[in-house]
Amino acid sequence: MPIGETQSLAIKLDNTGHRFLPGQKIRIALSTAYWPFVWPAVNNPTLTLAEKPACLSLPMLVNLEEKDVQPNPPVAPPMSAITQKRKPNSNRDVEYDFNENKVKLKIKDDLGKLLYHKHNLVTSAIKHEYYEISNNAPLSSMAQISWSFEYSRDNWMTRTITETIMTSDEKYYYLKAKVRAYELSLIHISEPTRRLV
């Protein structure tokens, strides 16, 4: 997009539905950043909204009759017998480090540990995510994600652990990954590093 020039843009909002009552207002916020879902732009851009001819066009649903969208919904098969050996748990922590001028986001999603009685398989999955960025320094961005999957039955057990780190500079994204595979003990390890444009 050209810098310093006025551009005419049409932005389609996520499909959603809302009923506005008389007197209610809607507010829209525009941003050049959506960290950590979208990697930040290198030059820390700014956005100015021209007052005219900015407009918001909302579609209106005129016929408010209820519709049977799916008259014959699919029927799921019966649940197999499962025992929960570890409850799922999810944590999200945001840390503001004022000394380093950084924002850190830590996410842990433990999907639990389950025993499937039909085939006596035990499954477990845990995900860790860590993101950090310095204020007004988009090149300081770092994302780190790891997954641990475990499958076991009787005296047999396999486990995989994946770790991925992403950083960037003005030209490239850098991906560093590590995969470890276990069958009772470590049997495979791989550590590729890639530079992407």
Question: Can you name each region flagged by the protein language model?
Answer:
Residues 1-190, 194:
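Glycine/threonine-rich phosphate-binding loop and adjacent beta-strand/alpha-helix elements that clamp
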